[in-house]
Amino acid sequence: MISESEKLAEFAAAVRNSTIKRLKQVPAGKENWRITPDAMSIAETAYHIIEADEWLIEKIENRDLEPMQGKTGTVKIDNNVEFRELIDRLQQSGERRCSFIRELDESRLLSTIFDKRFGKEVTIWWIIVRGNLDHEIHHRGQLSAYLKPLN
């Protein structure tokens, strides 16, 4: 029987692969494009997803960790090679996230942590699914929408 952590890791890998698929469709020279001046660029969004992976792992180890926010001005891509390197970092970050999730046993997934984003104690399972995977899916939807006017 497949464990819950294995199922979550498989889902996390599928989410990441889909995100990377979208990023690879970004036309060269459009990596820093943003829909509005105050919005994160495509590259900043990719970087933000990497930060969210790192935050997830740290939050589970450091229960007092404050929520993170995506920011503009974190990344500026000068050429397509740099963007491919950012995508590679995103792939590696996703692999680390999957390995981390796979190592969580059932009791750990069901343990609770206070998460300010939700205003209450939630399970680690909830932090992974709602706080990280759903968050990435949200940004992947943005990326999909951004691709339409760029292509």
Protein language model regions, located:
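Helix-adjacent hinge/juxtasegments
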Residues: 59, 64-101
